[in-house]
């Protein structure tokens, strides 16, 4: 009986710690209002460039354009990366 109680309490403690860590991570990833988004713009431009160059290279090789999968919630569409 003691072992079961200890196991339940341990699981509850782990769940609480995991939830707290997830909330802290989410809060750290949120942007503050009024914060300049120059870093985001640079990432957007980089993905746009990578995606369009990848498709152009494949087109010049007389192959169908197999669109490169963009990462981080982006998708290659019409030779540009678009947010999904």
UniProtKB/Swiss-Prot annotation:
<keyword id="KW-0964">Secreted</keyword>
<keyword id="KW-0732">Signal</keyword>
<dbReference type="Pfam" id="PF08089">
    <property type="entry name" value="Toxin_20"/>
</dbReference>
<protein>
    <recommendedName>
        <fullName>U4-theraphotoxin-Hhn1ac</fullName>
    </recommendedName>
</protein>
<feature type="signal peptide">
    <location>
        <begin position="1"/>
        <end position="22"/>
    </location>
</feature>
<keyword id="KW-1015">Disulfide bond</keyword>
<comment type="function">
    <text>Postsynaptic neurotoxin.</text>
</comment>
<dbReference type="GO" id="GO:0005576">
    <property type="term" value="C:extracellular region"/>
</dbReference>
<keyword id="KW-0800">Toxin</keyword>
<comment type="similarity">
    <text>Belongs to the neurotoxin 12 (Hwtx-2) family. 02 (Hwtx-2) subfamily.</text>
</comment>
<feature type="disulfide bond">
    <location>
        <begin position="70"/>
        <end position="81"/>
    </location>
</feature>
<keyword id="KW-0528">Neurotoxin</keyword>
<dbReference type="GO" id="GO:0090729">
    <property type="term" value="F:toxin activity"/>
</dbReference>
<feature type="disulfide bond">
    <location>
        <begin position="55"/>
        <end position="76"/>
    </location>
</feature>
<feature type="propeptide">
    <location>
        <begin position="23"/>
        <end position="47"/>
    </location>
</feature>
<dbReference type="GO" id="GO:0035792">
    <property type="term" value="C:host cell postsynaptic membrane"/>
</dbReference>
<feature type="disulfide bond">
    <location>
        <begin position="51"/>
        <end position="65"/>
    </location>
</feature>
<dbReference type="InterPro" id="IPR012625">
    <property type="entry name" value="Hwtx-2-like"/>
</dbReference>
<keyword id="KW-0629">Postsynaptic neurotoxin</keyword>
């Amino acid at each position: 009986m003691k072992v079961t109680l200890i196991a339940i309490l341990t699981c509850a403690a782990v769940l609480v710690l995991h939830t707290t860590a997830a909330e802290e991570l989410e809060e750290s990833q949120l942007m503050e209002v009024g914060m300049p988004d120059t870093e985001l713009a640079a990432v957007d431009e980089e993905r746009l460039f990578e995606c369009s160059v990848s498709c152009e290279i494949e087109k010049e090789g007389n192959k169908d354009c197999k669109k490169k999968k963009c990462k981080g919630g982006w998708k290659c569409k019409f030779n540009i990366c678009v947010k999904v």
